[in-house]
UniProtKB/Swiss-Prot annotation:
One of its GO terms (molecular function) is methenyltetrahydrofolate cyclohydrolase activity. The keyword Ribonucleoprotein does not apply. Its EC number is 1.5.1.5, 3.5.4.9. This is Bifunctional protein FolD. Signal peptide: none annotated. NADP(+) binds at residues 165-167, 190, 231. Pathway: One-carbon metabolism; tetrahydrofolate interconversion. Homodimer. PROSITE patterns: THF_DHG_CYH_2. The gene is folD. One of its GO terms (cellular component) is cytosol.
Length: 293
């Protein structure tokens, strides 16, 4: 039976640490941390995600600033909104909720966010900081995965890690974080030949491919640690990830569930980035350095 990598429980524990940091720092800072979430259009899933982030902010004591613009918004309007948030002294973190409506390019909008307020860690400068091992906001989902591994005493050093997926959102920063933790890292993608032969070499397997249950027992060596980043709705109802959990449960040493695994940690790391940005701006002491991969 695989060890359950319980992201929901860990997120709750980390929220308590963040709330303590906010309580202890508010007197010196003169205000709580602020997170602004920019949502464009009326995608139902995005609305749910934003509502969950607002609830998490409230639990920790982070002030939430929502900006909801219509899907017909022009890029110039979005850029002006981002520039206003960059200049707003109440805002320490800015998140552009993705995906954007068809016809809008996220690249120039992400580039317009102040790198020090980049709550999602997706600005080009922050990806460069990650590559060089310099301080800065970290991409939330990979940072959440690293926190989950640490919480269970799983040290990537010297291990073979395979990341399935090479997106700038998850796959590429995930590979960099594992490499920084001294793992030997291989990245698989849609052009990889004989995927199973590669993934069976993994001591740590992180799957962020965006395909429901594509990883089965034939892809995993006994005793591997498997982190499932995917989340999908089944046609018959319910949720599943990128791995077939039923097949991997008796095989893996550790497995993250869907839901309740990586998802809650992604939201928590968004708050970590925001609280750390606030702490840096106001030169506050903190004990959150272990959360930054």
């Amino acid at each position: 039976m695989a060890l359950r990598l319980d992201g929901k429980a860990l997120a709750k524990e980390l929220e308590q640490r963040l709330a303590q940091q906010v309580r202890s720092g508010c007197a010196k800072a003169g205000r709580p941390p602020g997170l602004a979430v920019l949502r464009v259009g009326d995608d139902p899933a995005s609305a749910v995600y934003v509502a969950n982030k607002e609830k998490a902010c409230a639990r920790v004591g982070v002030e939430s600033f929502g900006a909801h613009l219509p899907a017909s918004s022009q890029p110039e309007t979005l850029l002006k909104t981002i520039q206003a948030l960059n200049a707003d002294e109440r805002v320490d973190g800015i998140l552009l909720q993705l995906p954007l409506p068809a016809g809008l390019d996220e690249t120039p909008l992400l580039a317009a966010i102040d790198p020090d307020k980049d709550a999602d860690g997706l600005h080009t400068l922050n990806l460069g900081r990650l590559l060089k091992g310099e301080p800065g906001p970290r991409s939330c989902t990979p940072a959440g995965v690293m926190a989950m591994l640490r919480s269970q005493g799983i040290d990537p050093s010297g291990k073979r890690a395979v990341v399935v997926g090479r997106s700038i959102l998850v796959g590429q920063p995930m590979a960099l974080m594992l490499q920084a933790a001294n793992a030997t890292v291989m990245v698989a993608h849609s052009r990889t030949r004989d995927l199973a032969a590669l993934t069976r070499q993994a001591d740590i397997l992180v799957v962020a491919a965006g395909r429901p249950e594509m990883i089965g027992a034939e892809h995993v060596a006994p005793g591997a640690v498997v982190v499932d980043v995917g989340i999908h709705r089944r046609p018959e109802g319910g949720l599943c990830g990128d791995v077939n959990a039923a097949e991997l449960e008796p095989l893996a040493a550790a497995l993250s569930p869907v839901p309740g695994g990586v998802g809650p940690m992604t939201v928590t790391m968004l708050l970590v980035n925001t609280v750390l940005a606030w702490s840096r701006r106001h030169q506050l002491d903190h004990d959150l350095a272990d959360l930054v991969p």
